[in-house]
Amino acid sequence: MTNTVKLTEFINDNSNLRVLQGQECVAGKEITVSDVYRPGLELSGYFDFYPADRVQLLGRTEISYAARLDHDLRRKVFEKICQKETPCLLVSRNLPVPVELKEAAEAAGTPILISNDATTYLMSMITQYLAVKLAERSSVHGVLVEVFGMGVLLTGESGVGKSETALALVQHGHRLIADDRVDVYQRDHETVVGEAPRILKHLMEIRGIGIIDVLKLFGIGAIKDETEISLVINLTNWDSKANYDRLGFQENTRIICGIAVTQVTIPVKVGRNMENIVEVAVMNFRAKAMGFDAAKTFDENLTSLIAENSEEEKRG
């Protein structure tokens, strides 16, 4: 199913936009493409490959060029620009809208929006907004928290202690984004973002207590609507026979929305302070990203020590 954004929602979410003409047509319009188009060649009469299903943005360049056209040509061009599938026309900088454009838009049932903002700003702002709104979303089982400003997805089998660990992290001053189910989407080629489903927003389930409202119990500083997922921490029940990473050389990843995210596995055992371990895991991940790798330093020091001992044995 293709995601859509109703034009009414688009206008309400962006206070810098207002309807100049065609208010009665707004409710029936939907946006299905995140790209915004500036009709340039179309003003000269070239309409091959014209993407009529996009938001059409007209700035100072387009309006001034159209003003140089004769009346009949200007009318024909605007009639072709305004198609039934066109969600809306948007004019920047509060520029005067040509009469021919108003007539063509009215005939096609295309609303005209206007904004005081610059064209390039509107292009960037709208593209980013629509990219998020129209992104394909999927769900993963886990708890998403923000620790030291970094999005951490806690995963593991049911009952392993994900929610309890997240609650302890919130009490340490960190933030909850989503509990139990995390909706994820790809923001760009390198970024995956997680958020809570609307029905679960700010809520957490703690076994033995039930559903709690983190916002009301801990305040606005304890929650966040969404965050980029930078690290996955997989919590597993302690297995004495398992071969856990003791030095930190293993680098594993988990694919989320087609993006590889670093994953570490932490065994859960009675007596282990999981929130502190998660905090250390995040700090260690950030340190590695900055070029400080304790495991690598240890390996280099060990190799150097072995080499020195070998030289001493040869001399002895």
From Swiss-Prot:
GO terms for molecular function: ATP binding; magnesium ion binding; phosphorelay sensor kinase activity; protein serine/threonine kinase activity; protein serine/threonine/tyrosine kinase activity. It is an enzyme of class 2 (transferase). It catalyses: [HPr protein]-L-serine + ATP = [HPr protein]-O-phospho-L-serine + ADP + H(+); [HPr protein]-O-phospho-L-serine + phosphate + H(+) = [HPr protein]-L-serine + diphosphate. Mg(2+) binds at residues 163, 205. Residues 267-272 are annotated as: Important for the catalytic mechanism of dephosphorylation. GO terms for biological process: regulation of carbohydrate metabolic process. The active site is at 141, 162, 180 (proton acceptor), 246. Its EC number is 2.7.11.-, 2.7.4.-. Homohexamer. This is HPr kinase/phosphorylase.
